[in-house]
Amino acid sequence: GKLPMSRVWGMGTSASSDGQFFPTARHGEVMNMVNAKYGSVPGLKAYTHVSDQFAPFACQSIPATVSEAPYILDGLLMNEVGRHVREQYADTAGFTDHLFGASSLLGYNLVLRIRDLPSKRLYVFNPDTTPRELRKLVGGKAREDLIVANWPDIFRCAATMTAGKIRPSQLLRKLASYPRQNNLAVALREVGRIERTLFIIEWILDTDMQRRAQIGLNKGEAHHALKNALRIGRQ
């Protein structure tokens, strides 16, 4: 990204990430590495981050059976290239409100191509003031009091991830496993609900954002195609 000509493709401030399935040997069946989405062949996924300059800067080997969403932030925090990214694109159905909350706290604008977008509900601070036309889209009230009460702990979580003391994927999985009454988990979820609501509204209104996301995801697909072409025997 330091060569002047690299700016022809982008400024290095946006990136996309996606998983690519690779078949493994027979022992993969014993390790339960089979995902029905890819048929009966066992394998792993290489979850790769590619910058807007077509440069891959992070790659993680993850089980084919897990959701990709928790690993988005892991790749961004792996090195300085990812830390300079401001807008991150991903095509995933496994997102969580915790992911939206953590992404915002770490300074990333998360742009996901969400499946079944019309079915997603919005969260507002005062449902009574919501325009009548939008009330059917509102899923509930954002719990501002819970966010304020737990803000120091939320901030410490963000600092812990930034300092590399814990990987974001580990923290997100841990929070997801907590009982619903865990205040920190619920508070970060509330932050995520607010961020997701803002994103959905912006996505619907901003066609330029949709275009940027499509271009970014296409660059990731081009990188996948190159790896497929270079694989020996496509294996």
Locate predicted features:
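Extended, hydrophobic alpha-helical segments in both membrane/secreted and soluble proteins
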Residues: 43, 72, 88-89, 99
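Long, compositionally biased intrinsically disordered regions
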Residues: 136, 143-235
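Short, basic/hydrophobic alpha-helical segments
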Residues: 67-87
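A short acidic (Asp/Glu
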Residues: 25-29, 71, 96-105, 121-126
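Helix-centered, glycine/charged polyanion-binding patches within enzymatic domains
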Residues: 107-145
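Secondary-structure transition/capping motifs at alpha-helix termini
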Residues: 6, 50-54, 78-84, 106-109
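Active-site cores of enzymes that catalyze phosphoryl transfer or operate on phosphate-rich substrates
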Residues: 2-68
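Acidic, metal-coordinating catalytic cores used for nucleic-acid/nucleotide bond scission
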Residues: 88-98, 116-121
